[in-house]
Amino acid sequence: MHATTVKNKITQRDNYKEIMSVIVVILLLTLTLIAIFSAIDQLGISEMGRIARDLTHFIVNSLQD
């Protein structure tokens, strides 16, 4: 009986750690997305267009080599 109780507690602790890990990952992804969208918002549309154009030219030039 005691061994079963200990095993159940260990299983509960492992489940708790797994759930907490998932929550931490979700929070980090959320913060990352917020930071990315905030940076995009601060750059403005014209800057984003310029960056996209430069990136497109870089990719095309890389493929032509």
From Swiss-Prot:
Keywords: Cell inner membrane, Cell membrane, Membrane, Signal-anchor, Stress response, Transmembrane, Transmembrane helix
Principal location class: membrane
Cytoplasmic side: 1-18
Domain of life: Bacteria
Sequence intervals crossing the membrane: 19-39
Any one annotated GO CC term: plasma membrane
UniProt membrane topology term: Single-pass type II membrane protein
Location in or out of the cell: Cell inner membrane
Induction profile: By acid stress, via the EvgS/EvgA system.
Periplasmic topological domain residue ranges: 40-65
Family of the protein in this entry: Belongs to the SafA family.
Subunit field text: Interacts with PhoQ.
Function: Connects the signal transduction between the two-component systems EvgS/EvgA and PhoQ/PhoP, by directly interacting with PhoQ and thus activating the PhoQ/PhoP system, in response to acid stress conditions.
Entry protein name: Two-component-system connector protein SafA
Annotated gene: safA
